Amino acid sequence: MKLDKDNLRQDPFAVLRIRDFSIFMLMRFFLILGVQIQVVIVGIQIYNLTPGSTGEKALAMGFIGLAEAIPFILIAIFAGHVADRINRKKIILFSIAFLLLASWTLFYISFNKIYLASLGTFPIYGIIFCTGIARGFLAPTFPAYQSQLIPRVLYANAATWNGNIWQTASVVGPAIGGLLMGFGNISVAYAVSASLVTFSFLIILPITNVPVPKNEIKEKLSNSLTAGFRFVFKNQIMLSALSLDLFAVLLGGAVAMLPIFAHEVLKLGANADMAVGFMRAAPAVGSIIMGIFLAYYPPTKKAGRNLYIAVTGFGICMIAFALSTNIYLTLVILMLSGSFDMVSIIIRTTIMQLTTPDNMRGRVAAVNGIFIGSSNEIGQMESGLAARLIGLIPSVIFGGCMTVLVVSGIMYLAPKLRKLNLDQIT
């Protein structure tokens, strides 16, 4: 006997009982775990290899984000078109294979130090550029493929568990990366990261091949490429939600500067590299705690109000983070920022899943990726540049204040989002 919608909504584990979705989540866990370890290692490596002042190191670390954001933005719209036309599982496999190659190349050039000794940090930036291409294809394909594995009524439940998986990997990954850098060496750390990405490639193989939804309307390529933007910009609720997250991530990208905070603000000395891993993991710890709570009490009722509160709370956390000089207080603040971010992620993801037609999911997800995915990397660049121009701590305080100001503006300009109740849509 089939469960009705109310019973499905009330079961916090409903979506995990679907075999293909569970395998998909396991694959994402190991992929994110490997990538998060790599993120920590690359940040520390660039910091250590860059000579000069704090400002110069901050700018060099900001370039990591720019190196990944440029190909991501350039490829995302075309990737969204491809995700609505070609078997999505195949796209995921090819993209992970590309990430896998990049991860093992990072291991090779770090193990064979002759390349970094002669070319400096340029090979690292080049490899990160390549990962941006792979991410450009994965960003629209992941949510589009996920929606084909589950019934519509479970989209909010899936968003919660998807967030929990992401954040769990984001806790364990940086912590492992920090420990490997603290007790081992960089080559071992890269080898572990690359092995996890390889494992994720193998895990996805048994998942069912689901055909791409047919598009009954034949479109010109130019119209198809811009369809995602047209859809988003006509939808006030989705546009407002994406804009909130865009500015929060863009202006609150202080996490990219954690190696500098560990060394020069918190002054952790020999323990700084290990602390970077735990600081990277702290927001995800907060997200996991909030995610478990939201699995039982979804934020879908009065979703608009909850979204505004969450983004405001995130901005305030960034201000407090900049002012903290104690590692334990810093970890607590970062955990709080992660818990607010989790609320925002679940609401935004559910809005996108519920309001997007099946045959446009790839293209709309591509727009979401440009708004949110690339803003992480551009925010990293903005943080590095702002730190160089006005100082590290003032730049983070400014970003937090601007986040709160943007929330106030969008609350006034987007009444539909303010009144949104997602339970009425599902």
Stretches with model-predicted labels:
Residues 6-70, 230, 234-283:
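Helix-loop boundary and gating motifs at the non-cytosolic
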Residues 13-18, 113-118, 216-217, 229-235, ...:
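Helix-boundary and loop/linker segments of multi-pass membrane transporters
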Residues 14, 147, 160-163, 223, ...:
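Short amphipathic alpha-helical coupling elements at transmembrane boundaries
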Residues 20-40, 64-83, 87-100, 122-181, ...:
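Substrate-agnostic recognition of the 12-TM MFS/MFS-like secondary transporter fold
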Residues 60-67, 74-78, 85, 89-101, ...:
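C-terminal transmembrane bundle of multi-pass solute transporters/carriers
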Residues 118-132, 157-213, 274-277, 281-286, ...:
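Hydrophobic alpha-helical transmembrane segments
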